[in-house]
Regions:
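Active-site catalytic microenvironments for nucleophilic, acid-base chemistry
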Residues: 38-39, 60, 80, 98, ...
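Conserved helicase NTPase motor core
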Residues: 3-9, 17-19, 149-235
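Conserved P-loop NTPase-based nucleic-acid remodeling module centered on helicase motor cores
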Residues: 51-121, 318-334
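P-loop NTPase Walker
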Residues: 1-83, 265
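Conserved helicase motor core of SF1/SF2 NTP-dependent helicases
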Residues: 21-26, 30-32, 38, 42, ...
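Non-catalytic, well-ordered alpha-helical scaffold segments
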Residues: 68-71, 75, 104, 108-112, ...
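ATP-hydrolysis module of ASCE/P-loop NTPase motor domains
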Residues: 82-160, 348-373
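Non-catalytic, alpha-helical, charged scaffold/linker segments
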Residues: 322-360
Length: 373
């Protein structure tokens, strides 16, 4: 493969820490594959953001690369121990049942505190993880009591979660990942180098795991595509532990042509970006609106419900539309919506997810809890 003048120095680098700031469509993952192929004797870990990325990466990287999510690494050490009490996510009803309380406002704060703690790099669960009073410098005596009660309950739940014998409180995936991070795993016994893609959106837990490694490190990301800051994700490209790294840039995009690149550069200039994105892909047009008779069009939404509402609107306007659902229609939780509709109408026999019936007395209670949370 013919590498560009931007990719070649990255692929040939011998630096212990490599940092690549890359624009959209500039071949971030392709460059990492090239780096791996250029270093066939290195035992490389490609740390994937999620399982779908892991699956796709396994078909791209050479045999000296192990493609894993952080959860996969943690599962081999801790997750497997909790197989008998594992769950995808903790829910309000799990917390309420475990604490034997119907104070849903308090339960919501306890759950949020636990999720914040599990997503953080912190060793101890404490006030910084309690969302309600996070920005308050001073609290009233009543607020102090509520804070103490919430933190005490969150610690009780955490202790029960990590207790292998306590099957009354389940262990979520983020829980055993937290245990793995707290153990400060040393990956140098298995790997010589770690590759991190999407470095602009690293979970603090994963960032902490990477931070403690003493092996070669290459991080690639686009600082203009931070999507998960609302979940606490951090930009590893600007982290203290990457200070002194050999820096590179990827600015040539094959995803679109010069027209889109021109508009993107105008927008990015307002963020202070001085490097220019180059559009070397297919010729593209940027218009204020789409022609009414356009046979195909794509709609992008920030939320799943936005996609579903748009699809419903299209059905109203056209009785026989043809849709392509990115990721497959099953990934949009339509079955859950159908269950909720049946539940709201008292048609319990039509609800397929029986856990919904066990967790909530009726639809009124479901709405009450949903509004609080």
């Amino acid at each position: 493969m013919q590498w560009t003048h931007e990719q070649s120095p990255i692929i040939q680098s011998k630096a212990s820490k490599i940092l690549v700031r890359a624009f959209a469509g500039t071949g971030k993952t392709t460059t990492l594959v090239g780096f791996a192929k250029a270093n066939p004797t290195l035992r490389i870990l490609y740390l994937c953001y999620n399982s779908s990325v892991e699956k796709a990466a396994k078909g791209k990287f050479p045999r000296n690369v192990v493609c894993k999510t952080a959860h996969s690494l943690a599962h081999a050490v801790y997750g497997i121990q909790y197989a008998h009490k594992k769950t995808k996510n903790l829910r309000l009803t799990d917390i309420a049942r475990g604490l034997d309380t119907q104070d849903w406002e308090l339960v919501r704060d306890v759950l949020a505190t636990l999720n914040n703690y599990m997503a953080s790099a912190d060793a101890e669960l404490g006030r910084p993880h309690f969302p309600r009073f996070r920005d308050k410098a001073f609290l009233t005596s009543a607020q102090e009591r509520f804070l103490k009660q919430g933190l005490d309950m969150a610690r009780v739940v955490w202790r029960r979660m990590v207790d292998l014998q306590d099957t009354g409180m389940l262990m979520p995936h983020d829980g055993y990942l937290k245990l793995y991070q707290l153990s400060k795993p040393d990956l140098s016994q298995r790997f010589d180098c770690m590759l991190l893609d999407e470095g602009q959106d690293i979970n603090p837990v994963i960032a902490d795991i990477a931070h403690w490694q003493r092996i070669r490190m290459a991080i690639v990301g686009d600082p203009h595509q931070q999507l998960y800051r609302f979940r606490g994700a951090e930009d590893a490209l600007n982290s203290d532990w990457m200070v002194g790294a050999e820096e590179h840039y990827l600015t040539q995009s094959w995803r679109f042509g010069p027209a889109i690149a021109h508009v993107a550069n105008i927008i990015l200039s307002y963020k202070g970006e001085t490097r220019k994105l180059q559009g070397l892909g297919p010729q593209t047009l940027v218009k204020k609106s789409l022609p009414a008779d356009l046979p195909h069009r794509t709609f992008i939404h920030r939320t799943v419900i936005g996609v579903i509402e748009n699809a419903l609107q299209r059905v109203r306007n056209n009785p026989a539309p043809k849709f392509y659902w990115v990721g497959g229609i099953d990934s949009y939780s339509l079955r859950d919506l159908e269950d909720l509709y049946a539940f709201s109408r008292g048609l319990r026999q039509n609800v397929q997810n029986k856990k919904l019936l066990r967790d909530y007395r009726d639809y009124t209670q479901y709405v009450e809890i949903a509004e609080i949370s």
